[in-house]
Amino acid sequence: MMIAGIDEAGKGPVIGPMCIGGVKIEESRAHILKVLGVADSKKLTPKKREQLASQIKKHADGFFILEITPAQIDELRKIMSMNEIMVICFAKVLEQLKPDIVYADAADVKAERFAENLRRQYAKTNPAHAKKIEIISMHQADAIYPVVSAASIIAKVRRDELIEEIKKEWSVDFGSGYPSDPKTKAFLLKWGKEHDGKFPEIVRQSWQTVENIREELEKAGKK
């Protein structure tokens, strides 16, 4: 029986893409993930995550990483919530893996509702399999199921790679890209001042952080 885990990396940042990782492995071999030392990606150092990501890909029966750009996120947010975006993204990863059982980190305050919505979305492209597949959705699933931890790790490593590529390409250092990061805020404020309140394509324009900075700049300009 094939099991899979799905998790995201980069749902909250104001800068950079979001990555959804999926890992599939034969249930009888899933213990190897524990042997490798797979754990919640947030508790691992970047170097350890990179090492584990390589091992996970080597031992898994399948894996897939979906990358969503800031522009794609902004477009989707015009017509739906972030939770609805997560359902669509998780379903796209599920389409690539098609396991018998999937463990998903719930991107909804109600885990059961997330599972139902995921099944409904998946059924649009895989109606027959959607009836048979077992979907287990839980909060903090990456801390409970090693297969979800594995998915979280490969997603996080890929996002980190993309963030480093962005920093090199744009010759900027904006820190982690999270709204709570002072370095990220300072970068956005400086860029906004220098570019008349306009931000580059690496920034999620629909984030409240960006709106707040625009308002701040507008007020400062009126003084």
UniProtKB/Swiss-Prot annotation:
InterPro entries per record? RNase_H2_suA, RNase_HII/HIII, RNase_HII/HIII_dom, RNase_HII_arc, RNase_HII_hlx-loop-hlx_cap_dom, RNaseH-like_sf, RNaseH_sf
Catalytic activity as recorded in UniProt: Endonucleolytic cleavage to 5'-phosphomonoester
Please give the Pfam families that the UniProt record associates with this protein: RNase_HII
Keywords from the UniProt entry: Cytoplasm, Endonuclease, Hydrolase, Manganese, Metal-binding, Nuclease
Q: Which GO terms describe its biological process?
A: DNA replication, removal of RNA primer; mismatch repair
Query: What are the names of the required cofactors?
Result: Mn(2+); Mg(2+)
The note describing how and how many cofactors are bound reads: Manganese or magnesium. Binds 1 divalent metal ion per monomer in the absence of substrate. May bind a second metal ion after substrate binding.
**CC per GO annotation:** cytoplasm; ribonuclease H2 complex
Task: State the EC number(s).
Answer: 3.1.26.4
- At which positions is a divalent metal cation bound? D7, E8, D105
Q: What residues does the RNase H type-2 domain cover?
A: 1-219
**Gene Ontology molecular function:** manganese ion binding; RNA binding; RNA-DNA hybrid ribonuclease activity
Superkingdom classification of source: Archaea
Report the locations given in the UniProt record: Cytoplasm
Q: What class of enzyme is it?
A: hydrolase
Q: What does this protein do?
A: Endonuclease that specifically degrades the RNA of RNA-DNA hybrids.
Family to which this protein belongs: Belongs to the RNase HII family.
HAMAP family linked to this entry: RNase_HII_A (MF_00052_A)
Protein name in UniProt: Ribonuclease HII
Record the organism.
Methanosarcina acetivorans (strain ATCC 35395 / DSM 2834 / JCM 12185 / C2A)
List the gene name: rnhB
